[in-house]
Amino acid sequence: QRQMCIRDSPTIVVITDRNDLDDQLFGQFSRCASFLRQTAVQAESRRHLKELLVGREANGIIFTTMQKFMDGDEPLCDRSNVVVMVDEAHRGQYGLTEKIDAEGNISIGAARIVRKALPNASYIGFTGTPISTQDRSTREIFGDYIDVYDMTQAVEDNATRPVYYESR
């Protein structure tokens, strides 16, 4: 049933951790509006992000940064046809729990904050450097790999130049 919801005209939310990266990706998608048959939008604030999500029942491509999720506790949207795509998923997308330190300060992981804001969304993480340590695991946060695009494929596609190492 989860796959049916994803195929049911989802709203795509693209999350980055930096404004310059958000602007770059938004610009790339904006140039493809005719191919995508819709115009991407960039959320200006948490309130604007909520308006963009609540103001539609389906479709749409919304760009935002992680920081916009930090400003509130209430869910932004409870729809199940939202797909969250996180770029550079190895940076800052950890912590599904809340922890209390010796002084009683509560620390909430970024992954938990986003999932509280969009509790019924599906999540996809994009990274070139997945992390796997005790308290930071890209696979734990986003699940198994959907696809792996390695350096050999990138060179074959002319997406990157080959890297050569010469021992001295």
For each predicted feature, which ranges?
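RecA-like P-loop NTPase motor core of helicase/translocase proteins
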Residues: 1-3, 7-168
